[in-house]
Amino acid sequence: MTDFDPNQVSFAQGAVRIEGVIRKHKLDLNKIMTSRDQHVRAALKDLGVSNVPKGFGKVQLPFVFPQSQFFISHAEANGKVGEHAHHGGDALRFIAAGSVTYNGVELTEGDWMYVPKGVSYSLGIGARGATMCYCYCCCCAGFADVRDWIVDPGPEIARH
């Protein structure tokens, strides 16, 4: 066994740290943030993690999700995602490959984008396409995707 112990701090203690950093840096969780934003980069300096195995670096991100579902998506080159919002909850998008453009800023491999519940946005897809991992506090699947799995789908799902 190594000296690395990932169980030193509880989820709640980690959330308290994040709340403190949000206050210190006056981050607005009602606005979209990306890893390219200067004010976010400053906050991340206070969220570095030293409890990692040798040869690793780690930073905690400046938000907490109480529950979430994960998705991976692939987008064709030069595509567009029209203006939309996620009304069920906050979302986090990691760019795994390729690139997307949000509000004139290109996000590339390793970048991320936090999207608060209900905030509208659109994206452009880069020349190499994009592979993204999403963490949603909502589902984002369609009615047809869940219909066969729901015991009592209710009228909203049943009519689709």
Describe every region a protein language model picked out:
Residues V52-H86, E106-E109, K117-S120, P153:
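Conserved short histidine dyad/triad with adjacent acidic residue
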Residues F70-I72, I95, M132:
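Hydrophobic residues on conserved beta-strands that form the core of alpha/beta folds
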Residues A77, H87-T101:
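Glycine- and acidic-residue-biased ligand/ion/polar-headgroup-sensing regions
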Residues V81-H84, Y102-G104, Y114-V115, Y121-Y134:
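Short beta-strand His + acidic residue motifs that chelate non-heme Fe in jelly-roll/DSBH
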